[in-house]
């Protein structure tokens, strides 16, 4: 991607994808970017042999807690904890260029979706899939997990990427596209979680937006009825005659499930605000219609981290009044959780009260829609946590992504659940998570690897295409400069 990102996009919207792939960077921006790439290559080459590598970055949405790599505002690399080197990625945290005519953007790999959408909404455009939390980065969503309410019609974030400039573990910088020399890396990069390399920049497609989103909430009293409605939207693009540009849902229990269908709207007779005292997830139980600005819709879940702000007291009306609005956001809550994990404050309080220890169950899993009801019933019986987020998805392209083998054409539902549950007497940490992993496998699903996993090595590689990963690792990181996928996602290295 010297001064331009070149290549062809995945199938679907082929003409637009081709236009996106040919976006030219302005000369000054291109020169600054090339200088940043050269500096990163130099610092990477200077790392001691055998030293593990981490990015020193501002944010993280992973829940495999470990000591962070140090932030490096003024230096290209710093020695990290346990011998890990923290490479400074600050030069890759900006939107390099938005091309409204091509409906495309060239974006640094460490750019947050908050910054990206701030840049694109000025032009009446947004990425095809905008994950729910502001500080998720574009590179993180492509190499890890990213999903949202457009995923039934637009798939996953990698599917609207037309080109990536990647720094693999072997130290090269390569341009990967769907049909170029590094096409296998292009398709194998999703779900590699930084173990094959890091995306320095990505060229992505954009779609036009309207100023508002018109929401309609539909209630269901059984999981089966809810899954039938998801299948209806997948087949018809609407639910009970209402267009579905967006669809997700919230399950408060087996007999109280809501699907929220959104449609772009040029007008809004009123606009709700869930950045103040009102809380979005509670609103789906109320009036059946709602209107949000497009920006507020994109970040409707971030203000309360879905419902996970509750343990911090932020949903208490008095505390909410005192809690500054600028601190009602997911990265603040995540920092509080990380602090608690480091100091074991919640564990100590639980023990002091004489209560059983609690296990963190923080997962996103994809289940075929025809088995979605079975999963909800299994989860209610074995884990018993609520609410649960529901997000339908279907791959946009006809080609699978080797390391996360969802089947093209099949409709899945992502179930997200994030919290803690008490351990049964005699059980140890990991009990519920292992139950979830076994249940997901039995139902033909997969789970995202952004949080703790307990798979055996054989189970892991059977689920995540070990042979394909081994080929890519051999080609792009033959000396193992970067951690392996199993080592990183299961062993926490």
Where are these regions (language model features)?
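Noncatalytic alpha-helical scaffold of FAD-dependent oxidoreductases
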Residues: 1-493
């Amino acid at each position: 991607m010297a001064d331009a990102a070149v290549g062809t996009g995945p199938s679907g919207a082929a003409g637009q994808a081709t236009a996106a792939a040919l976006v030219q960077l302005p000369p000054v921006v291109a020169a600054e970017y090339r200088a940043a790439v050269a500096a990163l290559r130099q610092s990477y080459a200077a790392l001691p042999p055998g030293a593990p590598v981490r990015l020193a970055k501002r944010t993280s949405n992973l829940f495999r807690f470990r000591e962070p790599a140090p932030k490096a505002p003024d230096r290209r690399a710093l020695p990290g904890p346990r011998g890990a080197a923290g490479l400074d990625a600050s030069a890759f945290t900006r939107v390099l260029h938005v091309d409204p005519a091509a409906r495309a953007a060239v974006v640094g790999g460490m750019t947050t979706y908050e910054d990206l959408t701030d840049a694109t909404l000025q032009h009446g455009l947004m990425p095809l899939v905008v994950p729910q939390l502001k500080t998720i980065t574009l590179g993180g969503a492509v190499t890890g997990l990213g999903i949202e309410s457009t995923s039934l019609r637009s798939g996953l974030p990698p599917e609207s990427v037309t080109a990536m400039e990647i720094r693999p573990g072997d130290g090269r910088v390569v341009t990967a596209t769907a049909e170029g020399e590094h096409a296998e890396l292009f398709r194998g990069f999703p779900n590699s979680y930084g173990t094959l390399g890091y995306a320095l920049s990505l060229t992505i497609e954009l779609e036009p937006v309207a100023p508002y989103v018109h929401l309609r909430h539909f209630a269901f009293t059984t999981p089966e009825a809810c899954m039938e409605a998801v299948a209806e939207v997948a087949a018809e693009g609407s639910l009970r005659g209402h267009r579905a540009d967006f669809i997700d849902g919230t399950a408060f229990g087996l007999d109280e499930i809501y699907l929220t269908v959104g449609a772009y709207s040029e007008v809004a007779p009123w606009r709700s605000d869930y950045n103040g005292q009102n809380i979005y997830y509670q609103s789906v139980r109320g009036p059946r219609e709602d209107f949000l600005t497009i920006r507020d819709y994109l970040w409707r879940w971030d203000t309360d981290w879905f419902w996970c702000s509750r343990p911090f007291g932020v949903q208490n009306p008095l505390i909410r009044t005192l809690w500054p609005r600028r601190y009602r956001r997911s990265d603040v809550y995540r920092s509080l959780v990380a602090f608690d994990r480091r100091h074991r404050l919640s564990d100590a309080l639980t023990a002091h009260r004489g209560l059983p220890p609690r296990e963190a169950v923080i997962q996103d899993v994809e289940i075929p829609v025809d088995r979605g009801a079975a999963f909800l019933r299994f989860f209610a019986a074995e884990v018993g946590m609520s609410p649960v987020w529901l997000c339908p998805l279907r791959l946009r392209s006809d080609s699978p992504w080797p390391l996360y083998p969802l089947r093209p054409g099949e409709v899945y539902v992502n179930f997200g659940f994030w919290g803690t549950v008490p351990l049964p007497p005699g059980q140890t940490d990991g009990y519920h998570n292992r139950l979830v992993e076994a249940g997901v496998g039995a139902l033909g699903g997969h789970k995202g690897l952004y949080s703790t996993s307990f798979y055996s090595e054989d189970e892991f590689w059977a689920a995540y295409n070990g042979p394909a990963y081994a080929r890519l690792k051999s080609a792009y990181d033959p000396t193992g400069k970067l951690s392996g996928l199993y080592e990183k996602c299961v062993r926490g290295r």
